[in-house]
Amino acid sequence: MGPFRTKPPSGHRPYLVAHRGISGKAPENTLAAFGLACETAGIDMIELDVRLSSDNEVVVLHDRTLQRTSTGNGAARNYSVSEMKEFDAGSWFHPSFAAERIPTLREVLKLVDKRLWLNIELKSDFFFPEKSGTLEGRVLETVRELHYEQHVMYSSFNHRMLATMKRLCPTAVTGVLFSVARDYGRMPSKLAERVGAEVFVCAKREVSRRVVDDARNAGLAVYVYTLNSVTNAAKMIEMGVDGILSDSADEIVHYVKRPGV
């Protein structure tokens, strides 16, 4: 893939983003799920979640705790990477994935190898508040080490983390994730302006013509999650969104990328 651009060229189809990889066919946020995304023609980007281990390594994991998606238990922040690697991160999905382990961001970057862009969601932890800039800084170090700077965007519900990312790397592309509880009634332009973001990311239920028009007028791209059916994808394409996040990107790619869309 060439350098990341927040919007597809005028007249082109919206970006298709594999949400936590092809998480409908393989356990989310694993190398298996990301590998499937890389092998599926028509997918543009992978979305993944990152947080820190106890030894300050960047690991790819959605939840604060381990038990939903691995044989581990308790807060991920209490374990080192080597300790996490002891846990089975695939059997919960299907026994055939028992060999899957919680990957590090470095492992994912090496696997994807610029075949797809990445949307790295920065996760914050209320119970383990990070020293300002710790996760953001470690992510940037890894991305720079593997020369992925031009192939990635960063998103977060924690908009302070996005502001920190911009401070550490002014050229970083960021996306504000919309939280109903916190941001209800606020328009994309205002949320993005506060942290200098280029992308507005929200759930499908939050999308309206008013929201899309406001984002457009502010020059923002609009990405929507989580669209797992052709019906939902069709509605968002009609609204003019720029990116579609899906657990089943492999199943809707034929529609999203069909000629004429």
What is the predicted role of each segment?
Residues M1-V261:
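Phosphate-group recognition and catalysis centered on beta-loop-alpha active-site segments
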